[in-house]
């Protein structure tokens, strides 16, 4: 297997394949990220990671390994091996001739011919192509637009300011070619025909006319090819600049703007809208060159044939308004299609992000139907645009012929006799006009319309509301609302506080009459620890967001004196090493790092991770448990040196003992002397804070220390323990994680820790697969099969052949007509009018047939393409949703999304156009060859030679370009992954001032992509240039051959030369399009690759194995010798090990254990989400024998990470309209959300933002609880379902569950012991085994192992006594 490279810098991952591994650079060791080295070069590391070779190959450290990883950067750097730096781009050192002739591409062609290219074979991007430089220039230009008060900002003006001369200069070259060289060609053609027709005036100059023809063709090639490349190059740079600008803007969006702008929309801007820049700037010059050319050529033709010239030109001009209308329609259609594409991508993005929850709800099929419906609507809109393209393709072929027909018929009707010179001069001139007026000008109109539509979408995004620049430095910072300046008297008081808030009012929705925070007055002293508590949805997180500056104040005053660090309520990790996630761009301080790791209770996890803190954690921390993610996020915040730490409920995701450790050792220990604002629901810690803030409905309900609030009774109202118990919590003993009770073995990575992203235990990351070799015929067959099958293909092919027969027949008939007229004139005979009329009728019939057949063939092909796109998309979406969870752990979110965005965009829009081009050009070339062979069969010799040369050149080109296209596609995926990850962690990124670090990483990914894309367009243009040169040689042979083998008359010369001249554009374009077809088919290849995904199992069992509709009636659950692993590798270590236990019907079972003990894996086994041995029986039925939906529909789940979808509240509760509004309101009332939803503008129809960001995490968990109540299943699973809600709401919810699910079996995973202390039984798990299982009271008093006893005891003496009392009462009442 070839080594797969990884380009540095790599924020997203460190990729490896087999023996190839990536070692962090010294900058990575010091900063947590790979930054650019001084020459900004991309590099590939080939050294092993910082463990011994044996340990690396095994994927874990051996017992005897003495080379254990440390966080000491000096020790690490001592093991570094020399990097392999990517070489300088040969274009950077090429001279003028080399650049003009594309000689600098020879090394990559040579390498591509010998081997399969990958990222290691690329070069560093040119200085002018670097993303950061281009982004800086365009951002500066856009800022000038924003500061111009006199007019609306224009992205077009901003682009022209930066790239204007590079876009304008090619217009001069196009002007010279079109109005100079191409206009001269017909003149010399006429002279050459005159020579072979025996005209006396041309007798001595025929050879010179032939040479002039050849020279003009050569000059056209030498000017246009570099010009085309130059425009592609500048378009590519514009795209990079806009991508960088969009990413920077995304990092500045306010929460409100982010709610209105979905991540799918931002991804679509970069994947679909920006690439439309690639073609419009080239054709736009024809909007002014084309009209000038029409005037000049019309004048020249008028000089020769008089008013007849106007007939054809007017016909061509009459199509211009139609083209303008179609351009407008195309713009409107594209905008509508883009909106529908945004909607589809948003849905796909949400589904992929929440796939596990979707599977547990058994919602795959209904959501698949929704995406299918969205896809149909999207493709119906795209089809309208394709039909316009089909009309345009047909028009291109027949327009010049109709124009020629009108001019010649007019010329004949006027009583004049046309000669070969007249006929082929008109033909040549109209062919020139065809290129300009029928191809380039209409294309310019359509592409400019599409370009402007995309520009408007980017402009709209760039004008979205953004946060003001806030300087979170060591000095004081203010957020003072205009109109409410602080008085001089208050200034000194403000500076005495770490955080000072005066009369603050703020709201997320500017249109809402209600404030999220209202009348907030708060002074936080430097060095104090402040706890913020309150009911779910009371505004705790919003207060933190206001301090961060994320929630803008509507009135009042907020001042922060000092630098901030922040831990979010929902842990945010990116796909990188644990160390990268903790350092997050900060310099490496070994002593501080070790201290933070210890205080955040991560040492044990590091010891057991395959590569310690250099282990890849997976995208969004997918391979870690919730507790591990929370502690790594906390460590990131704590490692950052700041004076103020904002911790948004980091203790809810960990168990009681770890929470005690984090509070004692981290909050009160390591952060002693710093200001800490801690949002928490853990009341046992309240006696040990300096100040408590109680929030209710966005207002401060009470403020003070523990003793004063205890006397008011406000604290007691929040908890489940008695007032006496809480008073005794001051006697709690500090937690010692090194005590014997805490040295039980723990699994390092959560339930899917058995493999990291790479699917093994090595801690390495999965590398996206790159195909090799050519595109197989089977792939084409699969594509056309998806488009309607063999019959549809044959009908379309037959129609295309008939269309070309009609077109070639028209050309041949014209030659026949010219010969007939000239022969009659040569004999002094006049052809009768009846005969002339018959010729006119015949020619008219041929033209009409050409129009009909070309339209038919184009529409048929586009219809096939539309069907293929829909079926391919729906097929792979079905495969993805049916894939097992292992697939999602080894494939990045961005990589999967890439298939549904850029790859499907290629299949939808690019591939049909290329297919039409290839088919029509192939048939056109066949027609030309037939015509040439009919005139002089000997000309088939150079034609055959040309074909052989082109065939070998094409193969040489394809081997290189196909690999470059694949590498380009693979290098594109990290751009989307990085963008999506950054949008998810926006608050954390901004709070830690990491925007610049993230921007550099995004720029590095764009540079890696640019490296591949630039070489792709370079090799493409080099190939085109080479073919053009060969075409010039071919035309030279054809033209000069007439002097060696004189034809019978000038008409044959005119026919052959006009046909051969078309080859200079047609052949090179055709061969390039066949190559482009193969390259575009790589998108189909990447899409079809997902068709081979193995499904996780049948959804519905056969009738004989399907459980009864009333199943399960009892809710008994039996585990028999169950083993579970997260990889299909049967030899992999099991995460759950030989579990055997029985849960009785209607039993309430609490499941506890340290982070990574296997609690959530138990739930995965119940839902059959992973690979298992042994059996799970529910009411005596083996769940392995039934369909997945038969099983999952009968189990309700409240997941650990609550998931809401963008849409309405009703849609999130009941996406398929199965229940009445009354039923929904009843469920909301039972979970204490009725009042919250009632206060929304539209009640159940109120909008939910993407990811449910306009609701707190606790409220989202309550919505998930409402879903479970709606389903009324016999078995309920709660995985940390109330971890983020306050104790009072938790108590009310527990009461609701006890009432609503009295006759149900309930499994509850919880870190809060009081949540499960009244359960019938408690299951204690550790290292994937059940170590205790019994009633809570018995486990606390009679158990020999005392694991549960010790766990409860660690919560403190007072808490232990209160929990024991509740357990005893439950035991005695059972």
UniProtKB/Swiss-Prot annotation:
Residues 499-722, 1119-1352 form the ABC transporter domain. It comes from Drosophila melanogaster. Uniform expression in embryos. Glycans are attached at residues 561, 1254, 1353. The keyword Transport applies. InterPro entries: AAA+_ATPase, ABC1_TM_dom, ABC1_TM_sf, ABC_transporter-like_ATP-bd, ABC_transporter-like_CS, ABC_transporter_C-like, ABCC_6TM_D1, P-loop_NTPase. GO terms for biological process: organic anion transport; transmembrane transport. This is Probable multidrug resistance-associated protein lethal(2)03659. It holds the Pfam family ABC_membrane. ATP 1 binds at residues 534-541. It comes from the Eukaryota. GO terms for molecular function: ABC-type transporter activity; ATP binding; ATP hydrolysis activity; ATPase-coupled transmembrane transporter activity; efflux transmembrane transporter activity; organic anion transmembrane transporter activity.
């Amino acid at each position: 297997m070839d080594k797969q490279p990884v380009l540095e810098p790599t924020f997203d991952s460190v990729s490896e394949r087999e023996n190839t591994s990536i070692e962090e650079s010294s900058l990575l060791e010091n900063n947590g990220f790979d930054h650019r080295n001084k020459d900004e070069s991309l590099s590939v590391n080939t050294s092993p990671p910082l463990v011994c070779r044996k340990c690396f190959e095994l994927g874990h450290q051996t017992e005897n390994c003495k080379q254990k990883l440390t966080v000491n950067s000096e020790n690490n750097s001592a093991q570094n091996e020399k990097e392999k730096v990517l070489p300088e781009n040969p274009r950077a050192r090429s001279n003028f001739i080399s650049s003009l002739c594309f000689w600098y591409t020879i090394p990559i062609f040579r390498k591509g011919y010998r081997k399969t290219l990958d990222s290691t074979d690329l070069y560093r991007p040119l200085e002018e192509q670097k993303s950061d430089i281009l982004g800086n220039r365009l951002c500066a230009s856009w800022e000038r637009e924003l500061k111009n008060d006199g007019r609306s900002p224009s992205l077009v003006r901003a682009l022209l300011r930066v790239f204007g001369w590079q876009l304008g200069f090619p217009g001069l070259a196009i002007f010279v070619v079109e109005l100079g060289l191409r206009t001269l060609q017909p003149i010399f053609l006429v002279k050459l025909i005159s020579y072979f027709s025996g005209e006396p005036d041309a007798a001595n100059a025929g050879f010179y006319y032939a040479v002039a023809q050849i020279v003009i063709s050569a000059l056209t090639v030498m000017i246009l090819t570099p010009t085309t490349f130059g425009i592609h190059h500048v378009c590519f740079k514009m795209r990079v600049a806009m991508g960088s600008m969009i990413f920077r803007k995304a990092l500045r969006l306010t929460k409100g703007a982010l709610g209105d702008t979905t991540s799918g929309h931002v991804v679509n801007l970069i994947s679909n809208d920006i690439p439309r820049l690639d073609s419009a700037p080239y054709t736009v010059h024809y909007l002014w060159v084309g009209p000038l050319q029409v005037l000049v050529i019309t004048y020249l033709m008028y000089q020769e044939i008089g008013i007849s010239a106007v007939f054809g030109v007017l016909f061509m001009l009459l199509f211009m308004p139609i083209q303008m209308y179609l351009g407008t329609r195309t713009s409107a259609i594209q905008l509508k299609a883009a909106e529908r594409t945004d909607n589809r991508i948003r849905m796909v993005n949400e589904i992929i992000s929440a796939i596990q929850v979707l599977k547990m709800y058994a919602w795959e099929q209904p959501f698949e139907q929704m995406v299918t419906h969205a896809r149909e609507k999207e493709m119906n809109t795209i089809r309208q645009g394709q039909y316009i393209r089909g009309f345009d393709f047909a028009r291109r072929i027949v327009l010049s012929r109709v124009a020629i027909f009108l001019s010649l018929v007019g010329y004949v009707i006027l009583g004049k006799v046309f000669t070969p010179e007249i006929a082929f001069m008109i033909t040549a001139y109209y062919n020139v006009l065809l290129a300009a007026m029928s191809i380039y000008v209409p294309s310019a109109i359509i592409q400019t319309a599409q370009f402007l539509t995309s520009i408007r979408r980017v402009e709209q995004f760039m004008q979205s509301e953004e946060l003001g620049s806030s300087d979170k430095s060591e000095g004081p910072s203010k957020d003072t609302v205009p109109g409410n300046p602080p008085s001089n008297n208050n200034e000194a008081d403000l500076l005495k506080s770490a955080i000072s808030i005066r009369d603050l009012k703020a709201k997320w929705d500017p249109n809402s009459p209600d404030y999220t925070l209202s009348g907030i007055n708060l002074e936080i002293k430097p060095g104090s620890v402040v706890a913020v508590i309150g009911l779910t949805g009371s505004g705790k997180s919003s207060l933190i967001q206001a301090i961060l500056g994320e929630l803008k104040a509507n009135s009042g005053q907020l001042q922060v004196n000092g630098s901030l660090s922040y831990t979010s309520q929902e842990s945010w990790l990116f796909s990188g090493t644990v160390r990268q996630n903790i350092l997050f761009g900060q310099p490496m301080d070994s002593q501080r790092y070790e201290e933070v790791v210890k205080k955040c209770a991560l040492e044990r996890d590091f010891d057991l991770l395959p590569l310690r803190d250099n282990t890849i954690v997976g995208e969004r921390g997918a391979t870690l448990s919730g507790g591990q993610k929370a502690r790594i996020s906390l460590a990131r915040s704590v490692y950052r040196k700041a004076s103020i730490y904002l911790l948004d409920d980091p203790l809810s995701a960990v168990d009681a003992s770890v929470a005690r450790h984090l509070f004692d050792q981290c909050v009160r220990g390591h952060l002693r002397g710093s200001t800490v604002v801690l949002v928490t629901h853990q009341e046992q810690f309240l006696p040990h804070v300096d100040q408590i803030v109680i929030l209710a409905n966005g207002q401060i309900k009470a403020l003070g220390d523990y003793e004063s609030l205890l006397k008011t009774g406000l604290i007691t109202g929040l908890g489940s323990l008695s007032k006496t118990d809480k008073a005794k919590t001051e006697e709690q003993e500090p937690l010692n994680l090194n005590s014997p009770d805490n040295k039980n073995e723990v699994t390092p990575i959560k339930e899917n820790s058995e493999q990291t992203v790479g699917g093994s235990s090595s801690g390495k990351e999965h590398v996206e697969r790159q195909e090799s070799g050519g595109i197989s015929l089977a792939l084409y067959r699969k594509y056309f099969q998806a488009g309607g099958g063999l019959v549809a293909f044959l009908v379309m092919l037959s129609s295309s052949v008939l269309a070309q027969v009609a077109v070639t027949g028209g050309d041949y008939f014209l030659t026949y007509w010219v010969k007939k007229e000239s022969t009659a004139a040569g004999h002094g005979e006049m052809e009768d009018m009846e005969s002339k009329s018959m010729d006119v009728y015949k020619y008219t019939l041929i033209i009409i047939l050409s129009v009909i057949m070309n339209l038919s063939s184009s529409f048929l092909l586009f219809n096939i393409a539309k069907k293929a796109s829909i079926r391919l998309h729906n097929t792979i979406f079905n495969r993805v949703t049916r894939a097992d969870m292992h697939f999602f752990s080894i494939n990045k979110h961005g990589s999967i999304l890439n298939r549904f965005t850029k790859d499907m965009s290629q299949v939808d829009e690019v591939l049909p156009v290329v297919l039409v081009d290839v088919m029509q050009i192939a048939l056109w070339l066949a027609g030309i060859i037939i015509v040439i062979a009919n005139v002089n069969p000997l000309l088939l010799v150079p034609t055959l030679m040309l074909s052989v040369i082109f065939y070998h050149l094409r193969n040489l080109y394809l081997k290189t370009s196909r690999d470059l296209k694949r590498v380009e596609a693979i290098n594109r995926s990290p751009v989307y992954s990085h963008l999506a990850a950054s949008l998810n962690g926006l608050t954390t990124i901004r709070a830690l001032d990491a925007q610049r670090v993230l921007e550099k990483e995004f720029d590095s990914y764009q540079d890696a992509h640019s490296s591949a894309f630039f070489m792709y367009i370079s090799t493409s243009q080099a190939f085109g240039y080479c073919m053009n040169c060969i075409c010039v040689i071919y035309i030279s042979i054809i033209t000069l051959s007439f002097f060696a083998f004189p034809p019978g008359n000038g008409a044959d010369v005119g026919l052959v030369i006009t046909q051969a001249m078309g080859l200079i554009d047609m052949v090179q374009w055709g061969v390039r399009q066949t190559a482009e077809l193969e390259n575009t088919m790589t998108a189909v290849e990447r899409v079809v690759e997902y068709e081979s995904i193995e499904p996780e199992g049948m959804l519905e069992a056969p009738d004989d194995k399907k459980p009864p509709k009333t199943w399960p009636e009892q809710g008994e659950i039996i585990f028999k010798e169950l083993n579970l692993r997260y990889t299909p590798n049967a030899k992999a270590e099991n995460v759950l090990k030989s579990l055997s236990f029985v849960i009785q019907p209607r039993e309430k079972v609490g499941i506890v254990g340290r982070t990574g003990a296997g609690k959530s894996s138990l739930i995965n086994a119940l839902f059959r989400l992973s690979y298992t041995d042994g059996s799970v029986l529910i009411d005596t039925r083996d769940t392995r024998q039934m369909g997945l939906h038969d099983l999952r529909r009968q189990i309700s789940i409240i997941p650990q990470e609550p998931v809401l979808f963008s849409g309405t509240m009703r849609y999130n509760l009941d996406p398929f309209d199965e229940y009445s509004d009354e039923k929904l309101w009843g469920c909301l009332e039972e979970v204490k959300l009725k009042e919250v939803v009632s206060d929304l503008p539209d009640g159940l129809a109120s909008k939910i933002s993407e990811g449910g960001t306009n609701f707190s995490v606790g409220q989202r968990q309550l919505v998930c609880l409402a879903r479970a109540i709606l389903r009324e299943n016999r078995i309920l699973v709660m995985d940390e379902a109330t971890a983020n809600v306050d104790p009072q709401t938790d108590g009310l919810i527990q009461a609701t569950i006890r009432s609503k699910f009295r006759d149900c079996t309930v499994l509850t995973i919880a870190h809060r012991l009081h949540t499960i202390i009244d359960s019938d039984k408690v299951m204690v798990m550790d290292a994937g085994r059940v170590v205790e299982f019994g009633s809570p009271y018995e486990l606390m008093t009679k158990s020999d192992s005392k694991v549960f006893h010790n766990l409860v005891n660690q919560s403190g003496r007072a808490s232990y006594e209160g929990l024991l009392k509740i357990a005893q009462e439950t035991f005695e009442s059972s």
